[in-house]
Amino acid sequence: MRKELLLRTTNHSAFQNSVYLLGFLRFAKFQLSSRANISNVRPFKGRRTNCAATSVHSNRMEVTYLSQSLAQTIDNELMSDDVGYTTEQLMELAGLSIAQIICREYSLDRFKKVLIFCGPGNNGGDGLVAARHLKHFGYDVTVAYPKEKTKVLFQRLLKLLQHYHVPVVKSATGEDLKLYDLVVDALFGFSFTGEPRSPFDEIIHTINQSNKPVVSVDVPSGTNIDGGSAANALSVNSEMNISLMLPKEGVRHYGKKHYLGGRFIPNSIVEKYNLKVPQFAGDNSYVQL
């Protein structure tokens, strides 16, 4: 009986040792394979940034440039009962993509202090949302809001900024702008008509005289939305434009760095108006045009 028990114990120990040895050999093989793969990885040599460095160039570069009237028609339809978007939803989507694009192009170590000029309309609302997201991303953000809106939506956006400790000021002079690394122009969007009036004409002049890098939201403020020879004499001279929904005719020949943000046009609208929308890569909410 004792011999049989000893034999069983010996056989069981031998089996366990075989299992341990097999596991060790598999682990060693995995380690060698992993080291070989790591040695073949090339270091990323792109510009230093605190945002993801995935490609945002579209493989389908055909894009529809919207007239002012068509942009307004589509915008109204997006917020109709039939489609179902709200102004708040569109602002959040637009503002997030604006912040993500800025984060991609303007690294936190060089452009930490950001001043955002927000206008009285929805373009300004997009700027208020972008300010909050940039604060999330680590930027030191200030909002200049010359004509504060009293609508509940805008007051809620301002209240959020208070809770994020984002300063909101009435104006900013040329001397004030010297304190910032980047200026964002969210004064006027596609609904703007005519010439900029006070205080916005002075603000545009101050921005252009600052020699700071400037990013415009949707169109450089003061631009004639339909383009052509009737372009306004006074408009923001930005180095990058972030179009929303689809680019407008006024920036067809922009000629500088140009992104499309706000990935919110449903298939039904694309088909109804025969729109050409660039292909967004993966889960990106923006694409470089």
From Swiss-Prot:
Binds 1 potassium ion per subunit. K(+) binds at residues 123, 185, 221. Its cofactor is K(+). (6S)-NADPHX binds at residues 122-126, 189-195, 218. It catalyses: (6R)-NADHX = (6S)-NADHX; (6R)-NADPHX = (6S)-NADPHX. Coiled coil: none annotated. Its EC number is 5.1.99.6. InterPro entries: YjeF_N_dom, YjeF_N_dom_sf, YJEFN_prot_NAXE-like. Residues 71-277 form the YjeF N-terminal domain. GO terms for cellular component: mitochondrion. Disulfide bonds: none annotated. Keywords: Isomerase, Metal-binding, NAD, NADP, Nucleotide-binding, Potassium. The keyword NADP applies. GO terms for molecular function: metal ion binding; NAD(P)HX epimerase activity; nucleotide binding. Catalyzes the epimerization of the S- and R-forms of NAD(P)HX, a damaged form of NAD(P)H that is a result of enzymatic or heat-dependent hydration. This is a prerequisite for the S-specific NAD(P)H-hydrate dehydratase to allow the repair of both epimers of NAD(P)HX. HAMAP family: NADHX_epimerase. Belongs to the NnrE/AIBP family. This is NAD(P)H-hydrate epimerase. It comes from Plasmodium vivax (strain Salvador I). The lineage of its organism: Eukaryota, Sar, Alveolata, Apicomplexa, Aconoidasida.
